[in-house]
């Protein structure tokens, strides 16, 4: 497929594209076509709401959204930048959040990337088979540990 010229012009004007990964508005077919055409989202986030959170087999949290993009063929570092660094820059908070630089707010998540096959679905119930999953090990907010997996050691 091709990307609508109006969409490309919007990007040239500075419109930011977020894939809005939620149960009601993310389509795997459209995502695959966009990625194949070289049209990557600027920001990768969830568009999850309280009534849709933790509903398997949909991308029910950000680690699963990241895992879905791995299955779609995106490079891990590209995904992480779209989840951290790019949103921080777009919000005018570059160097303050979304980075591990000294002096930045220490909001940190540590994951274990595990080989595990599972299925995610989109709002049309189209499926993608994922072969890797990010499993949270530790979460820090403003430098304070908020969550630590019982078998994770600092």
Predicted regions mapped to residue ranges:
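C-terminal cap of metal-dependent C-N hydrolases
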Residues: 105-154
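Histidine/acidic residue-rich metal-binding segments in metalloenzymes
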Residues: 1-17, 25-42
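His/Asp/Glu-enriched, well-ordered alpha-helical/loop segment
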Residues: 29-113
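Short acidic-hydrophobic sequence patches enriched in Asp/Glu that either
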Residues: 2, 58-61, 131
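C-terminal amphipathic alpha-helical segment
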Residues: 16-22, 70-71
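Short, surface-exposed, polar/charged, turn-prone segments marking secondary-structure boundaries
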Residues: 14, 44-48, 71-75, 132, ...
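Active-site beta-loop-alpha junctions enriched in small/polar residues
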Residues: 20-24, 49-51
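Solvent-exposed alpha-helices and their adjacent loops that cap or buttress functional pockets
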Residues: 9-12, 101-102, 129-133
